[in-house]
Amino acid sequence: MIINSQEYLQPPQWWNERVEAGNLLSISNGEQEPTNYLMTNVGNGYVAFVIGGESIYVGGVYNGPAINLGDANNLPSHRAGIPNFQNIEISNAQFQYAGLDIENATYTRVYSIPSSPGTIVKQIFYAHQKIRNILVQEIEVDNSNIETDVTLQLSVVGINLTANVDFNILNLTNTQFTGNDYQLYNLTIKVPEVNFMTSVAVTTTTIPQSITIKSGEKKKHHYVTSFLTNIETNDYIEGSLDIYKTTFLLADQLIKSHLDEWNKIWISGIEVGGDSHLQQVVNSSLYYLFSSIRDDWSYGMSPGGLASDGYNGHSFWDTETWMLPPILLLNPKLVRDCLLQYRINNLPGAHEKALSYKSNNYTGFMFPWESAFTGIEVCPTFAPTGILEQHITADIALAIRQYYYLTGDLDWLIDFGYKALKGIAEFWASRVEYDQLNQQYSINTIIPPDEYAVGVNNSVYTNVAVKMTFEWVIEVATLINDTENIPFEHWSSIANGLVILFDEVNQWHPEYQGYNGETIKQADVVLLGFPLMYNMSKEARKNDLIYYEAVTTNSGPAMTYSMHTVAWLELESLENATKQWFRSYNNCNNSPFLVWTETPTGGAVNFATGMGGFLQGLMFGYGGVRIHQGNLDFYPQLPEGTTSLKIRSMNYIGSTFNVGWNQTTITFEMLTFNPSVYLTLLSTEYDNIILNTLDPIYLTFGSKFQIYFNNNN
């Protein structure tokens, strides 16, 4: 496209207002779109792509073997890249400005036409949120004030169907399936993870070489691409074609149903007063997370989101530890039906991994460090993490606990969660080693969250997480009267007898047995205080924080600073929290579209893990939210430079409410009620207010308060 010009169209006032409100990220006045590395994306949790990128990704579609021996010609399991049929270029147009509309989940480019001054062209991309199987592009040409016709030159760039590294592509165009207005392809991966050969049928509008708009006319052209996999149905080819035909006939109506669906998502969110940049970071982080997952497609969440092949598109502990908690407060159904259900669906793979350690006699569910389509281990064999980083199995158990404590969803816990929990406990019972002399249990030869430490013994994070896992499983068994069907005494003995390293003299936790001040990669011991909420004195919490801040590398991921922020706020040291807080979201400031990188200098792009950590710093740090059995705690504080914060439509035990605060007042507002329970607010100012009306409750800023529930009998 033509890009050189001395004068540029200016975005309209409404556009600038949306930028200021934090709902739109924009480039204008000669700024050019960033390279693909820092470019934004559109997605709906089923399908996604980077604008201008060569590949489209469908969740759950991977190419490459589970076991990879490091052969450069034998790519490991990774997201399979579908050619980007939506990558349409208008070659005779001049780029003017563009923006990601976060609220509407659309990306818009605006052009002028040098040969037709006054003609305005808009190119709008979106992944339809309601109809998950389609991508839509609109090219709208406003030639209404021009006295001559205008012709746009179109082409699809970057398409090479014969040299695709991930798929064998069969062109079914001009067969009995299709006509001249659209094209149909059957894409089959080249190498399966194990046995199943995933195929994707793609039906896409044929892109003309040119389109002409008559003088005085304003016209919109639609280009639709539909996807359907043999994961969903055996009739995926005919199904893709049917979806395409149906939606293309309704093309003018697609944008409305897309926006309506995103309006439902944004019922819950976070509002920031006084800092428009921070509001942009918050909204864009939520957008990138929400556009990567959906509740009717349970294929996990990768550190690089759905629009990239970062980390091969695999799911790690990042899902449960970093991304899940902020999503949980806003949309617990999404957590249950996508993130947790992904783990439940893949229990056979977790069992297979446990049994693969034949000389160790492991059993139960040992979740893989890297998981893709089947749930078996897909970490490349040259990386020790796939063998030794095992805390993920405890992390998943504690994520189930978070979900249950927040929702009280006992039916799901009984029907789905409990089976996973029992298998997790069985694994750890087979994994621990008993020291008869000291009558203690150890977990040896492990990699903790600090991945610089390889093959260490008694990682304090791992052991505390495992201890809590056993306590949680026993709690559930007691709740549902199933204690006679588990080895209650043995599991209790392990929970009480695990080695938990602690220096009584200096009141701090060594990271692992023999730790002696080595540099660490990222937050590890600090995670004992949050998210694990392990019982310790304030002195120990502070000592851990001071010690490990000093030995953490400056080139690690941003989540470290989020957790340090949470810790300092918990210790009521606002000044120290502020220093860490600004570092926690520095990794997205290199892109006009606030695309995160893993570290300050680069690494994985569209780093959803960092977004999740950042949002935790806001919600669990400055919101002071803590999820306990039977209650929620709050201790609202304000980040430097802001005038107010609000968590909108937070979910708890089937009810929803707003919690907002400024420099003088905390406002609590009920929105919807679960008729089966009643909520009560307890604070130093109010004693047990039953929350049975929509009338707001006002507390003095600086107050701590608690929401707890009782069943209506």
Swiss-Prot record:
InterPro entries associated with the record: 6-hairpin_glycosidase_sf (IPR008928), 6hp_glycosidase-like_sf (IPR012341), Glyco_hydro_65_C (IPR005194), Glyco_hydro_65_M (IPR005195)
Q: Which SUPFAM superfamilies match?
A: Six-hairpin glycosidases
Give EC number(s), comma-separated.
3.2.1.107
Q: Where does substrate bind?
A: W317, D318, K521, Q522
GO biological-process terms attached to the record: carbohydrate metabolic process
Q: Where is the active site?
A: E451
Output the Pfam families linked to this UniProt entry: Glyco_hydro_65C (PF03633), Glyco_hydro_65m (PF03632)
Q: Where does the record say this protein resides?
A: Secreted
Describe the reaction catalysed, as an equation. (5R)-5-O-[alpha-D-glucosyl-(1->2)-beta-D-galactosyl]-5-hydroxy-L-lysyl-[collagen] + H2O = (5R)-5-O-(beta-D-galactosyl)-5-hydroxy-L-lysyl-[collagen] + D-glucose
Recite the UniProt keywords alphabetically. Glycoprotein, Glycosidase, Hydrolase, Secreted, Signal
Leader peptide range in chain numbering: 1-21
What residues bear carbohydrate chains?
N104, N160, N171, N186, N283, N361, N457, N481, N535, N576, N662
Q: Name one GO cellular component term.
A: extracellular region
What's a Gene Ontology MF term here?
protein-glucosylgalactosylhydroxylysine glucosidase activity
**Coiled-coil ranges per the record?**
none
According to its UniProt entry, the function of this protein is described as: Catalyzes the hydrolysis of glucose from the disaccharide unit linked to hydroxylysine residues of collagen and collagen-like proteins.
Q: Belongs to which family?
A: Belongs to the glycosyl hydrolase 65 family.
Please identify the protein, giving its name as recorded. Protein-glucosylgalactosylhydroxylysine glucosidase
Instruction: Record the organism.
Output: Dictyostelium discoideum
